[in-house]
A protein has these predicted regions:
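Active-site beta-strand->loop->alpha-helix modules in alpha/beta enzyme cores, enriched
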Residues: 1-14, 18-138, 199-202, 206
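The feature marks non-catalytic terminal segments
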Residues: 2, 103, 138-215
Length: 215
């Protein structure tokens, strides 16, 4: 069994990590790993003019933080009035990510797949990928339902058995109740079941291994 000491998961928005890799993170934490979560937008909630209020947005991701026992680290990418982050692939964001990655000796970093059809996800991948010039650990791309496998095929090469964590994963995603429907929760569980069949277990999360360094 592979053992990880320090793991960094990077999502474009609060909820992305819960969707894509929270089962694996909970499993690795139980095995003793230190886990950090970085969100590419900043921590100011959207203005009240958009669909969800500040209070709702804050309470949702704070509930997820409490369940995970991890305080999210937010980057400095402000939100527009419609609630979307100004998230660009540029030197400023790459330098921010450089500093975040330098905080620990990470042996596993997880982020979005460039095949996601959400532009914020694609730019988050680009920022992380650009900051791994000297990184020598493993780099995984997560499958973030419902945004995955649209721009290019997601080809999973790593499967993590999350059978013991699937209900907690659903509870984490349910923290974002203002915009995740019961149908989406059902589909997330179905996807985990489909990936589990590939591993001959009940539920699994799938990842694409971008690279692995053996020292």
């Amino acid at each position: 069994m592979t053992s990880y000491k320090n793991i960094l998961a990077v999502g474009a928005h609060p909820d992305d990590i819960e969707l894509g890799c929270s089962g694996a993170l909970m499993k690795f934490m139980e095995q003793g790993a230190n886990v950090d979560i970085v969100i590419a937008r900043d921590d100011n909630a959207p203005k009240p003019s958009v669909q969800r209020s500040r209070e709702t947005t804050l309470s949702e991701y704070q509930a997820s933080q409490e369940m995970l026992g991890i305080e999210f680290v937010f980057m400095n990418n402000p939100l527009t009035d419609d609630g979307r982050p100004i998230l660009e692939w540029n030197n400023t964001n790459i330098e921010q990510m450089d500093r975040l990655i330098a905080r620990r000796d990470y042996d596993l970093i997880i982020t979005h797949s460039p095949g996601d059809h959400h532009n914020d996800h694609v730019n988050t991948y680009r920022i992380v990928n650009s900051s791994l010039r000297r990184y020598q650990g493993e780099f995984w791309l997560m499958e973030c339902c419902p945004y995955a496998n649209k721009n290019q095929e997601f080809v999973p090469t790593v499967f993590v058995d999350i059978s013991d964590y699937i209900e907690d994963k659903i509870k984490l995603v349910s923290c974002y109740g203002s915009y995740f429907t019961d149908t989406l929760l059902h589909n997330i569980k179905n996807l985990a079941g489909y990936r589990g069949q590939m591993l001959n277990v009940e539920y699994a999360e799938a990842f694409e291994l971008r690279w692995k360094t053996i020292r």
